[in-house]
Each structure stands twice: as structure tokens, then as C-alpha cells.
């Protein structure tokens, strides 16, 4: 097959591993920087161009779209879809999962475990908002943040009020969540492909830090999932309509709670922690599913 990988940097671990795994299985790979693409949108022969050249027809496309280029990246992916290229994850599913508030609303509708979350636009609502999530300590998150950036643990009510007021003063969209103390600064990344959790790792924050993201110095180790955790991860990915997803779960006294569903999960941490060839499993999934070029939107909302 001819497969395009949408990525801004061919040297990134995930991009290079996917290319390596696909070529090892006999496929022809082209890495396409979505920001270098421009589109001809018409009713007869829609096309994508880079530097004056029209891109050839691809059988499948693997989107590795960073959060900062979601708008343009998903526009390019939609164009691939219009041209009949099979997407690993569909543009509508990626857009859905990138909206943190919308994704939590969709998950709650499916009765999937979540931390209690509050959202408001007016400073006058802050006291009631904090009461909703159980007071301090609480977690305040920028809706546009990634990799733990824009996430604040407010340990006192006064600190929470000050941080929320500051963010609101900057016209930033934020949500406030209950702090799950029993998680102990750890979360679980479940790597979902299709209808299976093919790998899972526990990410532990550094001492004195509550964000367990590996980009923030957290450590990763292999973990055994409970049946409920496995089921929660699969249901969360399905609700978003994602074929491949990284589902982040906290272990709480109320059972597993979903923090986020990532449409472009990194491969380095999970492959090194578990020893599983995740890249090859993604390519195998494409091989089994690319026969149907009709793009069907999964999930609701």
C-alpha cells in the first residue's frame, strides 16, 4: 500500500517508528507536513499540493497532528478523506477529542467515569464552581493545554480563586476538576487500537509534582489493568470515534476515571515501558481495515 504519514517532523520517534514498521511490511511511505500542504477543493477532482506538486493517491493516511495545528491539520485530513484515502483516525473524531470540554460531556453521556468537572465564564460563579468539585485542593486546566502545560494544582481555596480569576482575566477558557488524592500522582495510559487495549503503562510524577506526563519528567512502567479499566478505555475511545487512542485513566476509590482521550498518542513511552511493538500493530490494523475507503464517522456529537 501507499501510506501517507501526516507529521511536521520526520525525525520524531513516533513518526520514524511508524515509517520503519510500514516499510518493514512492504508498504511505500511518504511523510507529509500538513502545514506545507494546500488544497484544491472542487466537485470533480479534489487534490492536495506541496510546493507546486500534486500529491499522488494514497491508500491510507496516518494523522500525527499536534494540538497547535489542529485546525489546519484536520482540514488537510478532511481533504484526504474527500479524495477517498482511508484515515487511521477520522478528522471529525480528532476534532471531537481535542475539545476537552466537549469530550468530557460526551463521555459523561455514556456514563463513563470522570472526575467531577466545573466550567464557567464569570468570576461571580467561582465560589459555587469550587463547591461543585469539592473545594480545595482542586485542579485547574486550560482547555487548550497539552503535555501538562496549563495545568495547576490549587492547594487552598484562596489559591484556586486567584488562579481562576487570573485565567478569566486573560480570557482563557478553563475547567476546574476535583483532585483525586488517592491516585498518588500517577495515571495509566491505555493504548487502544480498534477494539483492544494492546498496551498499558503507569506514569508516575516526580516527587513534589502531580502531573505525570513523561514530557514533565514522569517515569513509566508496565502495569496490569483490571477488567473495568480495560472496558473503560475501550468505551472512551469508541465514544470519541477513534480507532487509535491513548486513554489516560486515574485509579480512584470510585473506580477508573478518564482524564483525557488522546487522538495522537506518542509511541516512545509506551514502547519502551512495555517492549511491545505498537507501531507494527498500528500498521497491521490499517492492513485489515483499509479495504473500505468509505469514511464513516463513528461516535456521537
Swiss-Prot record:
GO cellular component: cytoplasm
GO BP annotations listed: protein modification process; SOS response; translation
Cofactor(s) for this UniProt protein: Mg(2+); Mn(2+)
Residues involved in Mn(2+) 2 binding: 260, 262
Binding site for Mn(2+) 1: 248, 260
Residues engaged in binding Mg(2+) 2: 260, 262
Domain ATP-grasp: 104-287
Alphabetized UniProt keyword annotations: ATP-binding, Ligase, Magnesium, Manganese, Metal-binding, Nucleotide-binding, Protein biosynthesis
Binding site for Mg(2+) 1: 248, 260
Family in the record: Belongs to the RimK family.
An annotated Gene Ontology molecular function: ribosomal S6-glutamic acid ligase activity
Binding site for ATP: 141, 178-179, 187, 211-213
Gene: rimK1
Pfam families cross-referenced by the UniProt entry: RimK, Rimk_N
Name of this chain's protein: Probable alpha-L-glutamate ligase 1
Class of enzymatic activity (EC top level): ligase
Top-level lineage group: Bacteria
EC number of the protein: 6.3.2.-
Cofactor: binding comment: Binds 2 magnesium or manganese ions per subunit.
Amino acid at each position: 500500500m501507499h501510506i501517507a504519514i501526516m507529521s511536521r517532523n520526520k525525525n520524531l520517534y513516533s513518526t520514524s517508528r511508524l515509517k520503519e514498521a510500514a516499510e518493514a511490511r512492504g508498504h511505500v511511505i511518504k511523510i507529509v507536513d500538513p502545514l506545507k500542504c494546500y488544497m484544491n477543493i472542487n466537485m470533480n477532482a479534489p487534490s492536495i499540493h506541496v510546493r507546486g506538486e500534486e500529491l499522488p493517491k494514497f491508500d491510507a493516511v496516518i494523522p500525527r497532528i499536534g494540538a497547535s495545528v489542529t485546525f489546519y491539520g484536520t482540514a488537510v485530513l478532511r481533504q484526504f478523506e474527500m479524495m477517498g484515502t482511508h484515515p487511521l483516525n477520522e478528522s471529525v473524531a480528532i476534532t471531537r477529542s481535542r475539545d476537552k470540554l466537549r469530550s468530557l460531556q460526551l463521555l459523561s453521556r455514556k456514563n463513563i467515569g470522570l472526575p467531577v468537572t466545573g466550567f464557567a465564564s464569570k468570576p461571580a460563579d467561582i465560589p459555587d464552581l469550587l463547591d461543585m468539585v469539592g473545594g480545595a485542593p482542586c485542579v485547574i486546566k486550560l482547555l487548550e493545554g497539552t503535555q501538562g502545560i496549563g495545568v495547576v494544582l490549587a492547594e487552598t481555596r484562596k489559591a484556586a480563586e486567584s488562579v481562576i480569576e487570573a485565567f478569566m482575566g486573560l480570557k482563557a477558557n478553563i475547567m476546574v476538576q476535583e483532585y483525586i488524592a488517592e491516585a498518588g500522582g500517577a495515571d495509566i495510559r491505555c493504548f487502544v487500537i480498534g477494539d483492544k487495549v494492546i498496551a498499558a503503562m503507569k506514569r508516575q510524577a516526580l516527587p513534589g509534582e502531580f502531573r505525570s506526563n513523561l514530557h514533565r519528567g514522569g517515569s513509566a512502567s508496565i502495569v496490569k489493568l483490571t477488567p473495568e479499566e480495560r472496558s473503560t478505555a475501550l468505551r472512551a475511545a469508541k465514544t470519541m470515534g477513534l480507532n487509535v487512542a491513548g486513554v489516560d485513566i486515574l485509579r480512584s476509590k470510585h473506580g477508573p476515571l478518564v482524564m483525557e482521550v488522546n487522538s495522537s498518542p506518542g509511541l516512545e513511552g509506551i514502547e519502551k515501558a512495555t517492549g511491545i511493538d505498537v507501531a507494527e500493530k498500528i500498521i497491521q490494523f490499517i492492513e485489515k481495515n483499509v479495504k473500505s475507503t468509505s469514511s464513516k464517522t463513528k461516535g456521537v456529537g
